[in-house]
Amino acid sequence: MLYRKKNPHGGAAYEAGVLLDLSANTNPLGTPPAVLDAVRSALDRVRDYPDPYCRELVAAIAAHEGVSPDRILCGNGAAELIYAYAEAARPKTAAETAPTFSEYSEGLARQGCRVERYPLREENGFLPDEGILAFLEEKRPEAVFLCTPNNPTGRLFPPALMDRVIALCRELGSRLFVDECFLDLSEGGVSLRSRLEEWPGLFLLKAFTKSYGMAGLRLGYCLTADGDLLERMSACSQPWNVSVPAQAAGIAALGQKEFLDRARAVIREEKPRLKAGLEELGCRVCPSDANYLLFRGPVELGEKLLRRGIALRSCANYHGLGPGWYRTAVRTREENERLLAAMKSAGEE
């Protein structure tokens, strides 16, 4: 028997018959060759335990982010760090937007935390608005979870509004968790890492998964000036949680700025074409600042595409969405055209 949690996301590539997995929002160019070379070289060391402190990787991240090494904790993917944060911080109440990434509330629920949700409006393009400030003042949560660009909507959190949220969280004594995992592949996104030293309540989540096409290696990290929190999070994680190949891959990936630049150029060119193609097929496509698009189509679309070997991310289980909502990664011209051709064929059934 196979054991897995309800409504899993990721891993569609392993389902029978899937030839094109658009459910995972990874780099459209795949994995940098230098990263693959680093993984191959690391195989000679797999008989040894990995460094439990990820010292070389942490030093590389510190140089890349311009922060002190003691502000960094690495994990077995961003998801592990979400769960470790929830266990270490143990807020009794939390707030998030809806829709957003489900692992925040999953991790919080395991700690008995009550989660309040601020609804993002479709008529506003799912863009966060000033109403979230009054919502937070009313709910006064112990922790606030935000995602920029948001998953699945692809919208960046407006910088001026983020400044006000930070100020309000400091005033309320609320921790602020900001997921920046898709920021590297977005247009115009600016990290909050320069704000870390202002306030230890700020926590940033990062991942190699999306930016460098490394979902199968599981590698993420977080940044915060709250050293006590990082120590508790580390205690919540299993030892040797980042493998030898993953650590080597992370170090190599951080030197791939040109690869990221090329990926962003592909996304910049292909996203408008894909959006227009989806709209021509009668879908309602939401604005996006990220490397993926949220759209509404026929309820049966997902199943019809699976029969044609293509997997989308069904967003039916997201708070604030429902059946007929889908998310697709923006990929290469050829892959995007395969999707559109399959959708046209499905519509003719």
Q: What is the role of each PLM region?
A:
Residues C54-A94:
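Phosphate-binding glycine-rich loop
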Residues M1-D48, R140:
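N-terminal "arm"/small-domain region of PLP-dependent enzymes with the aminotransferase-like
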Residues F126-R140, P152-S211:
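Active-site pre-lysine segment of PLP-dependent enzymes
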Residues G30-P32, Y53, G201-C286:
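PLP-dependent aminotransferase class I/II
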Residues R117-P119, A143-N150, L176-E180, C286-P287:
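Short beta-strands and strand-loop turn motifs
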Residues A160, R307-R308, N317-E349:
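PLP-dependent enzyme catalytic core of the Aspartate aminotransferase-like
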Residues R268, L278-G309:
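Conserved PLP-binding catalytic core of the aspartate aminotransferase-like
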Residues E87-L146:
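PLP-dependent aminotransferase-like
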